[in-house]
Amino acid sequence: MRACAILVVAAAAVLTGSTAISSTDALELATLSKTAQDVELSSVAAQPRSNIQRRLRKHKTVNTNSEMEYESEAEARGLVPEKLTNLVNKFKKVGGEVMLKTKSLNQLKKLSEKMEEKSLYALTDLEKKGYTPETLRDAIKNTPPKGMKDADADELIKFYDEYWKIFH
């Protein structure tokens, strides 16, 4: 009997506490929504009646160059991150100038074709001199050309092997 009475009292306390909390939340929500409406109404009332809508400014905001210089300095603008600026500068210095000077992908394609033609002439010239892939490999190992790195020599041998397989 005592346990039942304790459970009933505990349940009543929980229910009254939860209803009190929910009513407090509802009261706060009503107060907040009323103040938000008041703020909206006061901001609308502060504007002239004829021009309630806000409009974006026109693209051209100044008449002369001097006004434009002043306007551009005074106006807040989005700043480019320093990392991005450094990256663009490095790109321009390293190899971007070559890409920026080209006008189209067709020009790059023509350049690539010219390079392929030159390399094809060089490979056919090696064949005319009597080199096979094995003899070329031995010749490079025995007397490497001046200024040629090992990676370049390996690449030349690889290209000549492919050329030999295609044309023989």
UniProtKB/Swiss-Prot annotation:
It is found in: Secreted; Host nucleus; Host cytoplasm. A motif (RxLR-dEER) lies at residues 54-77. Induction: Expression is induced during host plant infection. Coiled coil: none annotated. Residues 1-20 form the signal peptide. One of its GO terms (cellular component) is extracellular region. Keywords: Host cytoplasm, Host nucleus, Secreted, Signal, Virulence. The RxLR-dEER motif acts to carry the protein into the host cell cytoplasm through binding to cell surface phosphatidylinositol-3-phosphate. Belongs to the RxLR effector family. Effector that enhances P.infestans colonization of Nicotiana benthamiana leaves. This is RxLR effector protein PITG_12737. It comes from Phytophthora infestans (strain T30-4).
